[in-house]
Amino acid sequence: MALFHHLYSLAGGNFADLNTAMIALLSKKDGAVKMGDFRPISFIHSVAKLFSKVLSIRLANVIDKLISPAQTTFQRRKCIQDSFLYVQNTVRKLQRSKTLALLLKLDIAKAFDCVSWEYLLELLEVLGFPPRWRDWIALLLSTSSSSCLLNGVPGDCIDHLRGLRQGDPLSPLLFILCIDTLHRLLEAATSSGLLAAPPAAAARMRTSLYADDAVIFINPVREDIDTLLGLLRQFGDATGLLVNLSKSSAIPIRCSDIDLATILVNFGGTTATFPITYLGLPITIGRIRLVQLQFILDRIRARLAGWKGRLMPLAGRRVLVRCVLSAIPTFALTALRALKKLFKEIDKSRRRFLWAQDDEISGAKCKVGWKTVATPEQQGGLGIHDLSRFAHALRLRWLWLAWQQPNRPWVGTDTPCDSGDVALFAACTSVSIGNGTSSSFWSSSWLGGRQLCSAFPALYAASIRKNRSVHEALQGDRWVLDLRHANSGNIACQVVQLAREIRSVGLVLDAQMPDSIRWTQHSSGMFSTKSAYTAQFAEGQLGSFRCLIWKIWAPGKIKMFLWFLHQDKLWCNDRLQRRGWTNCYFCPLCMRNLESSFHLFWECPISLKVWNQAAAWAGCQALNPDGWCSETTSTGCAERIITTAAPGNRKGTKSMLALIAWHIWLERNSCVFRGKQVDERHIVEACRRDIEQWRLAGAKCIEQSFGDMT
């Protein structure tokens, strides 16, 4: 604290000794020999980094007020897809309206490394930063230095004269302040007449910025292009952010009938055509095609190529499918309306890795149907995302943000949401009417928590103005006038019914209060992708699978075994018999009855002895078979054991249940495949040995005996 007080008061001292950084090279691949094979990383002194972090936290609280809507990076509540969606929608609007335009993708050369300190400090003064703040920034910049680590030995000190250090928490925020001036410069040039204004109906803003990725919309006129190039040169001279025109590109929109070569003669960059890639996603004029989403499949296959599925247990492959393969398409699915064929191809790769490891997949290798696998854990699945439903949940964020933050640049334009998304959003939200200007009369759930388009489909189909707001529709009963071309005899009853419902709520519009929306699928009332995804499985039957299988302390292979048991997918003799495969019919342990998974674990006399001995040894009477004799399913028996156990012992009882069932299965396999003689004492002893190993591994829920049932 004394050091921070010293820095706060700018009391002098040699801060340069604490504001150093070490630059090391990390290899990008094995056998790296060239400079291009290494990635430099800067390790900043912890004191300087802490001071910078404090300043960045304070600046982050006000950065939204200082930055124009054109910049969407390094800010809370904004994301990369905002910029992509705005640019794509603007391109499509220009294309549909047959408006001639050019999209310029600019490359800023070594953006972070070239920022002028003099420009930055002057900009902070213009933005109203107090002198003390500017002095702190000047101190951090002027005393910074770096040295290169060569074989672990630091080299000569390199003093900095410009630029912002990567790895510094404050650098990203300072950088977007610097580059945001480009947007304001072009807006000023447009206002003064130096640049012709873009079509207002199609492009709200001329510029879209994401960090140093800049897109500019401009009219395809040589004078405008030359003026823009001059402004970019002046901007680079003042800020140090020079545009590398050789790596920049111009993409024409509806410019097939003009001489682009003459217009772009001074541009110096390349000319491209749609589709193009912007921020890692394809921008297309028409419908997206599978070939434009091939990069998603390529990334998944590249991951699979480096994995050795044969060397992984099924539980490990499940984790990789859930956490890696299913996460790869998330970025694209948020902003794009993907094709069903893409989901099929991704599911094929996920299914193959899960069930067939590195071999070709076939139905015979899939132990459980994919529909069940791609179901939430609490409903009996493996919790692997159903990508089609997950994509719906991801896209609902656009409908939610359009309500919550209507100042985003893309609001009012097309979103990737389809009619199914709109219906799901309406079913999961409730709208409170204020002035009625934000709520859709037909699509919003403002009357009794339901959509009028669903409650009165005939009226909705007959309406000629389906996009009216509640405010517009109720003014003079315009919603009734919109039905004037319909067959009044068929819809008269519904008109009367809807009119009565509207009058019954006594709705009074308040011009001073905006409409509000609440997400009904979460107690906070705020949207989340997780709750939107879960809501799509509301019709499924909730069970105790998550608590009985996935939330217990046990190795992954035992959890997978329990899942197969609860799914009745273990290869017992009854399943073999149903398929007409060779089997010995009888239970290998007792040799009395047809072997089924239920008989093997819950009815077999040998298994019952094991449960009895385990209950006595562990002091857990919940494991006594007398408690589940009336149950008819494996899930029912397991639930009865858990509910019978004392509340404080239930976690340990779940682990004990899993371990005993696992060793019964191992003993059964030894009898079938090795011809071993059954010995229930061997099963109990094996359970005791594993319990000791689990305790050493950190299973606190079974550290002590359970004691009697309470």
Question: How would you name each of these model-derived features?
Answer:
Residues 1-4, 9-10, 14-22, 27-58, ...:
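A helix-boundary/hinge signal
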